[in-house]
Amino acid sequence: MTPKCSERASALYKIFLEGECVITNSRTAEMCKLTENSFRDVNIAFANELSLICAEQGINVWELIRLANRHPRVNILQPGPGVGGHCIPIDPNYLSYNVRAKLGYPFRFVELAQEINATMPAYVVQRAQNILNEDSKPLRGSTVLLLGVTYKPDIADQRESPAVPLAQQLIAKGATVQYFDAKVADWRAVPEAERVDDLDAAVAAADLTVLVQNHKSFDVEALASTAQRFFDTRGVAEDSDKVERL
């Protein structure tokens, strides 16, 4: 792309955008996009690794991150059941593949972050099994209700949602998986999962309810109080005997 092309593209964007249009060459612009999403992937992986460590030591990772982020030069993102969408799970893969293919060595931070984030659904399954075992219930044959199966809150986009491997692994271990998501009428990625329409009744009946995505429409406290057991992977539920956090 020539400098003249860049100037004209910038002029076009300024017609309908209020933000600053910064011009650079196409290779740097592409690398910038990959870098942004890879950095977020690494940051989320750090938060997820922290959540594993804190769970083993009885530390509230959400409080820990909130306190650490009071430092003006610290900005740790939030842990969760995995990463999703068409950017964070994809761009770091593209970047690390090209580094290996063209330069002959690994992009170690990015590859480790991908490994950590990819294991989170399996970790959630293991924690779910532990919670049920505490109630003298096996995972096999238990009903697990997933709340929110999109990749981020308040949208219908399911691309690369961590809810997919989470549900698939629960089913593989013999659990009956149900889901509730007002944004998703037909969860084609996991056809074995049963969609429920009566949220309150489903939460009350399920052996374990897992908050996977925190849509604004969810009254988390009411749902947690109704549930037999409530596994909060987003750190939003208040403490109670029924609630277990990631």
Model-found features: residue ranges?
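Structural/interface elements that position substrates and couple domains in central-metabolism enzymes
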Residues: M1-L246
